[in-house]
Amino acid sequence: MANTKDSYHIITMDTKESSIPSLPMKEIPGDYGVPFFGAIKDRYDFHYNQGADEFFRSRMKKYDSTVFRTNVPPGPFNARNSKVVVLVDAVSYPILFDNSQVDKENYFEGTFMSSPSFNGGYKVCGFLGTSDPKHTTLKGLFLSTLTRLHDKFIPIFTTSITSMFTSLEKELSEKGTSYFNPIGDNLSFEFLFRLFCEGKNPIDTSVGPNGPKIVDKWVFLQLAPLISLGLKFVPNFLEDLVLHTFPLPYILVKRDHQKLYNAFYNSMKDILDEAEKLGVKRDEACHNFVFLAGFNSYGGLKVFFPSLIKWIGTSGPSLHARLVKEIRTAVKEAGGVTLSAIDKMPLVKSVVYETLRMDPPVPFQTVKARKNIIITNHESSFLIKKDELIFGYQPLATKDSKVFKNAEEFNPDRFVGGGEKLLKYVYWSNGKEIDNPSVNDKQCPGKDLIVLMGRLLVVEFFMRYDTFEVEFGKLLLGSKVTFKSLTKATS
């Protein structure tokens, strides 16, 4: 190891450089099986024999390591390379965010890239590498736009959520239960459209009331290689052939996607004017904002909002009473729902972060090593060679029992007070929660907006209701949540 300093970059717990590994070197365990067939076998394990969580847990146990080699979906023929080094602990995971050592170009969704035809033929910002000048321009536009719109976040959210409560109460009254997911999807889409499209209601545009359904279809066709429908009447081999073997064509959503694009293009003049000043063509800028609003933000909220309601609902009346007291006291003192009032709600903030820890909206991160790297987990150091793919499975990394006490349990107080020091291990935004997105990284530009929306959802809920009951199940993406009862506020 005499020449290690010249050959490798050492990544420790805080991704700082060191001259020698602080932990003993260990060969990365695992294997890829027989060429081609090994990838197919692992794909079947992932989708049909084990499921995603057990797929990674079983290999972690088999190799007695949180760093190991395996194939990940989709494999042939959607992805050129299915061979990865998997990271499932909180210590090694941050290497995925160090863009000086890894490259995320083309790896937004996993080990594959959907066709640019889904985005007007453009390679949108999510797929660009940080060294690409266009990435700097586009992400800078995203960040400056969100900064400019900051004062509109709360008013637009308040406008959008009113119809959600009306729908929720009406359905509960008529049917005895209310399925939250489509109602939450409508809230998310309406808020994001109004935010970027100068306050316009999407119903009054070319998408009409079908915005969420159009985005769902558009996103599904791109993420199909990672999804299993779970239909009992469809043989596994047939579903695998259709969804996981070859890319699904854009033509299946072209007409609807054009409606979505037109609605944004005709409603965001100010943003497109600003893009032109930066040298970005109007249609390219529009496709990037459709991706930001539809794939990034709406797609994430589609998982996040039901999870948030699920965890709060199943925590019961005692947590609800504490949230009611904190929220209504702060709102009364501030004279309304304001940013300053929300900042005085540590329990609300902790509940939102704990939800993002338990159920990160984007479970997979993929990067390619730019050079030979030595990473560490809790026990050992490992060499990852240049051009190897590194794959993070976040739902295990953020439940690392050596970092979080009772890591598999939802603890609403986890990030209150001194617990805030653990926020550096919350990675849902493709970065540490304590970091802020910049033009030089791949962290979600809407990171703070998504957290604020979660906090606002909790605040608005408990301004109207004292408690509620839910039941939940699983969907293709995230949790299925159904309200069984709502108790309106008594004070």
From Swiss-Prot:
Tissue specificity comment: Expressed in roots. Not detected in aerial tissues, including cotyledons, leaves, stems and flower buds.
Keyword terms of this UniProt record: Fatty acid biosynthesis, Fatty acid metabolism, Heme, Iron, Isomerase, Lipid biosynthesis, Lipid metabolism, Lyase, Metal-binding, Oxylipin biosynthesis, Plant defense
InterPro entries reported in the protein's UniProt record: Cyt_P450, Cyt_P450_sf
GO terms of biological process kind: defense response; fatty acid biosynthetic process; oxylipin biosynthetic process
Pfam families membership: p450 (PF00067)
Molecular function, one GO term: allene oxide synthase activity
E.C. designation(s): 4.2.1.92, 5.3.99.6
Binding site for (13S)-hydroperoxy-(9Z,11E)-octadecadienoate: 296, 302
Residue numbers binding (13S)-hydroperoxy-(9Z,11E,15Z)-octadecatrienoate: 296
Record's catalysed reaction(s): (13S)-hydroperoxy-(9Z,11E,15Z)-octadecatrienoate = (9Z,13S,15Z)-12,13-epoxyoctadeca-9,11,15-trienoate + H2O; (13S)-hydroperoxy-(9Z,11E)-octadecadienoate = (9Z,13S)-12,13-epoxyoctadeca-9,11-dienoate + H2O; (9Z,13S,15Z)-12,13-epoxyoctadeca-9,11,15-trienoate = (9S,13S,15Z)-12-oxophyto-10,15-dienoate
Residues that coordinate or bind heme b: 104, 135, 139, 442, 444
Co-factor(s): heme b
Induction: Not induced in wounded or jasmonate-treated leaves.
Domain of life: Eukaryota
Keyword flag Oxidoreductase: no
Free-text function comment from the UniProt entry: Cytochrome P450 metabolizing both 13- and 9-hydroperoxides of linoleic and linolenic acids, but with a marked preference for 9-hydroperoxy fatty acids. Catalyzes not only the synthesis of allene oxide, but also its hydrolysis and cyclization. The first step is the synthesis of (12Z)-9,10-epoxyoctadeca-10,12-dienoic acid (9,10-EOD) and the final products are (9R)-alpha-ketol and the racemic cis-10-oxo-11-phytoenoic acid.
Similarity comment: Belongs to the cytochrome P450 family.
PANTHER family: ALLENE OXIDE SYNTHASE 3, CYTOCHROME P450 26
Name of this chain's protein: Allene oxide synthase 3
Gene: AOS3
